[in-house]
Design a protein with these regions (language model features):
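Broad gene-expression machinery/nucleic-acid interaction feature
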Residues: 3, 30, 60
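Compact, glycine-rich, soluble single-domain proteins
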Residues: 9-48, 52-57
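C-terminal structural segments of small proteins and small subunits
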Residues: 56-90
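Short amphipathic
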Residues: 1-10
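Generic anion/oxyanion-binding catalytic loop in active/binding sites
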Residues: 8, 39, 62, 66
Length: 90
């Protein structure tokens, strides 16, 4: 099991569009993946679960993965968060 924290810096946090990119990326991996915020943990492959966390700009999440490709999964999802889900910061 692998865990890593990440802080959302995109303008609107984890709303519908970034959450969709996030779960699409998470679903590329075989590992079980969760997102945790404020002691609440949801399946990272579930759009409703991820949206229900209500993560806003500056919010910190913990990514947790368990499985054969856990390292790759965490690295890919952290990269997605750190690059603002491909959104411009205008």
């Amino acid at each position: 099991m692998l865990m890593k924290r990440a802080t959302l810096t995109n303008q609107v946090g984890l709303h519908a569009r970034p959450a969709t990119f996030f779960i699409q990326r998470a679903n590329e991996f075989k590992s079980s993946i969760w997102v945790e915020r404020d002691d609440r943990k949801v399946n990272a492959k579930s759009l409703l679960g991820v949206l229900s966390l209500g993560v806003v700009k500056g919010g910190e999440i913990t990514l947790i993965a368990d499985g054969d490709d856990e390292e790759e999964a965490i690295a890919a999802l952290v990269h997605l968060v750190e690059t603002n889900f491909g959104e411009s910061e205008s």
